[in-house]
Curated annotation (Swiss-Prot):
Pumilio repeats lie at residues 198-233, 234-269, 270-308, 310-345, 346-381, 382-417, 418-456, 457-490. Keywords: Chloroplast, Cytoplasm, Plastid, Repeat, RNA-binding, Transit peptide, Translation regulation. GO terms for cellular component: chloroplast; cytoplasm. Pfam families: PUF (PF00806). The pumilio repeats mediate the association with RNA by packing together to form a right-handed superhelix that approximates a half donut. The number as well as the specific sequence of the repeats determine the specificity for target mRNAs. This is Putative pumilio homolog 8, chloroplastic. The gene is APUM8. Residues 10-20 have a biased composition (Low complexity). GO terms for molecular function: RNA binding.
Length: 515
């Protein structure tokens, strides 16, 4: 069952090993519809550890969790209210569903309390992207909750935390409808919110929850230094796991932005404590974001050295991975040429493997662009030496084209020597034909040799009708001049009968055949 999803009680089983389950609260209220259950994955390491609410006796209501004060409309929050459908009263809230009990009598709430609409309440509601951490403040909840009537302890086995001290009214809002009204979010920066110290011991669990994670990020922005220190001290043992968590990774990115150099070094020491650990994080869809942010933020020689040493053993895996290649690119962007030496050396060593890979070919071009001097010369020379093979590869041909555009004359000379005598076969292949066109447009010195090879074909009519070679001939007609252009036109004209062929139409256009 997905997180925050409700179903029949018979479809789930309680996991006795879950650290988050609690014994039934002695004063738990009874629900009419006891066949509904709530289950959610809330384990620290084992996804099979679960907590679930299976019966009325298990509902130890919290004044800001179980009574719908912590509710997720899409069911994505692990801290969720009881089922939204069918478990709430209708007479007091104008049809809005919040997941409350059907009858206030079951909660031991008096008549005066039922109609008391001005009681101030706070809730941990759906977070909006406005930096409020997901906390909303409302008046007119409709139920004056009493500490002796409803347990104030968390339903997840957490300690009691009375939220009533932090309630701030939102004027003009009343009823349960305000809880889901985005306009009901308080924007007053002076309002007092719960302190992280009140959640001490549970920051790790909050970091893995969608709304809890956002609240913790808000603390880094507007909370006290003590609160930020509490968060850091509680997440530092779990940084590896949180970096690869769908929600925790955002907290780790924020932490790297706001922490000091000593704390950043602590984080780096944690993620590099085991061989291959930083590589594993970099290959993860969520972890790669945090490692990229880490690379952006490192400043000291110790930090840079630790990161380089941890990444180098997995260089080839990283550069060919959908997620990992972005870490290498971020190193190229953020580190100095000297610090990227290990990247340039390994890129030269594994040049063919990288150039012929979907992701690797892109990173190889970035390596050439960010390198200089001897480092660039080695990379370009390696590509030039293998240009004939690379030109025919779906991805390698891009590396050859990139070198051609650099206008490095020694590299181009070596490349043209490799390609000489193969222009016809290269022109008739899908990938290498692009490279021949690029030679014609960027290397004037290559044009005579290419044209001579093309017109020397015994059956030139086959060449101009080829789905790929016809583009090479068009490019040759467009860039050649003088006697070379005239020679090419003389060879083409006798085949004018083919002018209606779909591949020959542009070749026989008036503009291209002009002398």
């Amino acid at each position: 069952m997905m997180r925050g999803e409700f179903g029949e009680a018979s479809s789930l089983s309680r996991s006795p090993s879950s650290p988050l389950q609690t014994e039934p609260h002695p004063q738990s209220p009874k629900f009419y519809r006891n066949h509904y259950v709530f289950s959610g994955d809330h384990s620290s390491y084992n996804s099979s550890s679960r907590f679930c609410l299976r019966s009325p006796s298990d509902y130890s209501l919290s004044s800001y969790f179980s009574n719908g004060l912590c509710s997720s409309e899409d069911g994505s929050s692990q801290f969720a209210s009881p089922p939204l459908d069918g478990l709430m009263t209708k007479y007091n809230f104008g049809g809005d569903d919040l997941g409350l009990c059907e009858s206030f009598d079951l909660l031991n709430v008096g008549e005066e309390d039922k109609t008391h609409h001005q009681t101030q309440r706070s809730s941990f509601g759906n977070y909006e992207a406005n930096g409020d951490g997901g906390f909303r403040y409302y008046s007119g909840f409709g139920v004056d909750q009493k500490d002796h009537q409803i347990s104030n302890s968390w339903n997840l086995g957490m300690q009691s935390c009375n939220m009533n001290n932090y309630s701030v009214p939102v004027h003009g809002k009343s009823g349960v409808g305000a809880l889901f009204d985005h306009q009901g979010i308080s924007s007053n920066p002076n309002e007092s919110l719960p302190k992280v110290s009140e959640f001490q011991g549970y920051v790790y669990f909050m970091a893995k929850d969608q709304h809890g994670c956002r609240f913790l990020q808000w603390i880094f922005e507007d909370g006290s230094a003590l609160d930020a220190l509490v968060i850091f001290s509680e997440v530092i043992p779990h940084v590896v796991e949180l970096m690869m968590d769908p929600f925790g990774n955002y907290l780790m990115q924020k932490l790297l932005d706001v922490c000091n150099e000593e704390q950043r070094t602590q984080i780096i020491l944690m993620v590099t404590s085991e061989p291959g650990q930083l590589i594993r994080i970099s290959l993860n869809a969520y972890g790669t974001r945090v490692v990229q942010r880490l690379v952006e933020s490192i400043k000291t020689r110790k930090q840079i050295s630790l990161v380089k040493s941890a990444l180098r053993p997995g260089f080839l895996n990283l550069i060919r991975d959908l997620n990992g290649n972005h870490v290498i690119q971020r190193c190229l962007q953020c580190l100095s040429t000297e610090d990227n030496e290990f990247i340039f050396e390994d890129a030269t060593k594994f040049c063919i493997d990288i150039a012929t890979h979907r992701h690797g070919c892109c990173v190889l071009q970035k390596c050439i662009a960010y390198s200089s001097g001897l480092q660039r010369e080695k990379l370009v020379t390696e590509i030039s030496r293998n240009s004939l093979f690379l030109a025919q590869d779906p991805y390698g041909n891009y590396a050859v084209q990139f070198v051609l555009e650099l206008r490095d004359f020694s590299a181009i000379a070596a490349m043209l020597a490799q390609l000489k005598g193969h222009y016809v076969e290269l022109s008739m292949q899908k990938f290498s034909s692009h490279m021949v066109e690029r030679c014609l447009t960027h290397c004037p010195e290559s044009r005579p040799q290419i044209v001579r090879e093309l017109i020397s074909v015994p059956h030139f009519d086959i060449l101009i009708q080829d789905p790929y070679a016809n583009f090479v001939i068009q490019a040759a007609l467009a860039v050649t001049k003088g006697s070379l252009h005239a020679t090419l036109v003389e060879v083409i004209r006798p085949h004018s009968i083919l002018r209606n062929n779909p591949y020959c139409k542009r070749i026989f256009s008036r503009n291209l055949l002009k002398n």
